[in-house]
Amino acid sequence: ILPAFAGPDIAQDEFFIFIHAGGAWDVTVGLDPRNEKVGIIDPATSGARGTIDPAPIRRWVDSSAAAIDGGLVYAGPSFEFVRPEGNSPLVFGPAIGDLLRHSARLTVVNGIAMNTVSHQDGTAFSSTGRHLAGTKAAASSIDTMMADATGLNQLLPALSVNFPSFYVPGPDRRAVPLTVSSIGAVGSSLIRSPLYETAAQRDAVNIVLSQEARALGKMSAEADILNGFALQLDGLRRMNQQSLLDAFTTSKLQAAYNTFRFSDNAAVINAAFAVEALTRNIVRCVSFAFSSFDTHFTNYRQQPLQQQRLFDMIATLLDYLDAKPHPTKPGDKLSDHTHIMVFSDFCRTPQINLNQGRDHYPNNSSLIISPRFKGNFVIGQSDPEQLLPLPRAFSDGMRAITPPDVLSTFVSAFGADPRKYLRDGEVIRDMLKG
């Protein structure tokens, strides 16, 4: 156990939710839309020979322009852009779904240069800011970074459900995310049999052990180690006293947060857990994956629907965060202190392939929803003919935005030094409030 109070006392009342859109999303129907056949770009189309199924896409409206002829591969009308009301710089594809009503909070980053089309490498690059070293992560992931910077005294600094979480030595080891395949797996580990002792007896044992650890700490030359034991035992007491099993039980979460559409994707339950865990103040960072975006074939017809389900989930998540009081800041809501980042491996090709799907492409977009970032804001661009990232001004010259830039900006927003965690990347201050 490392020193119990290591690191600066920063952002101790903030919470973080990280979502990986697994498989590589098609930004041309979502965050960086295209509805014209220009250059090598084949926009999504509806109709009998179209590339997608528009029926379940609530914001799909056939374009008033002439139908697009994709030769033997596809043909049909594309879509009308989706814009927020008022004079907004944001433009979306029809997959944005219910999240459109929260557009005033959204920070969209387009034209992110990935320099890879490998799922594993792109995922690691997006979450750590470093490409893989062979098959191994070269840096810790963003949930580990924020757990180290803000959550070491939390009961669970970081909990990761199928998220690309990595730990590389440097941050405090208490920041290592608890990685599980499902929320229910954590619930199973919390079940205690009453056959041998009662909850009160277990609590009494924890009290004695905590007192003993502190007493030994007063006599030890390495008091921090024993104080760390005491903190862990205190955390175990809080966990037992809160009946945390309910927070990790799927049926309980579904009943408590019944406006989520749990049938949309197995990952939706993780969003409900995030609200419950933050409300109880037991987790600093919740990270999870929302999958099924790898659409190389005719399964591309469902790509906009999968994105709509993702964005609908985030919209409902924000609704709950708006309604829930912050556990330690009276008068504030969870949404005042919860920060969300969404990213994918990379994006999909602007061309439709012969299988009526899209392949891998070294461009990307990211979405941030945070009170510390400018809302109703977009930064970065991809070119209109090839969907490749366009350069912008940085201190080292003109270049495209990269994942390390996005991660550095996010880390810096909470008073932490990006250089503690990231080798590369420049803080993009234009994205931050103030």
Where do the PLM segments sit?
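Ligand-binding pockets and gating/stacking loops
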Residues: I1-G434
